[in-house]
Amino acid sequence: MKKPFLTLITILIVSCAQTNNKANSENNCNSDPEYFLLRPEVEKAYGYSHAVKICNQIKISGAVSMDNQGSPTAVGNLEQQMKNCYSDLQKILKHFNSSFDDVVVENIFTTDMGKFLEVASYRNDIYGDRYPTGSWIGVKELALPEFMIEIELEVHVSEEKNEIEEYPDQDND
């Protein structure tokens, strides 16, 4: 009776230690935040970064339909504005060696929920059958009156992608 009891205690201690080590390694991120500006002049003028990566998490500010000078594009056309937002988000994800497959939260703000619901199926092409969590929020207005939609993302990059990005010159076999 004493031997099975000791074996059980040993297994419990070892498994707790492994769980603790894994939790500690996930919380031990020693990298500094990496800031990314998609349109540096615009973002500096308004005082924000379009994206910030800390360890394996990326927070992406709301994308709106604008040109490189910060002027609204596709004015009055919510569907095209949405496509422009996703195009900008794709550029940001690519910068971080990531994709829409890594998106875990997507929040959409729109001034015309009815029209958005008509064109929301475009997202099927982006996410396939792996949709992120998130919210669709109808708002009175966005930063400029011409903006009809704004999309913000949170991304989780796998450890494998992080290692490839952080050590591109090393062989990852």
What are these regions (language model features)?
Residues 104-106:
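Surface-exposed aromatic
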Residues 4-13:
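Sec-dependent N-terminal signal peptides
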Residues 16-87, 91-96, 101, 110-173:
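N-terminal presequence-like segments and the immediate start of the first folded domain
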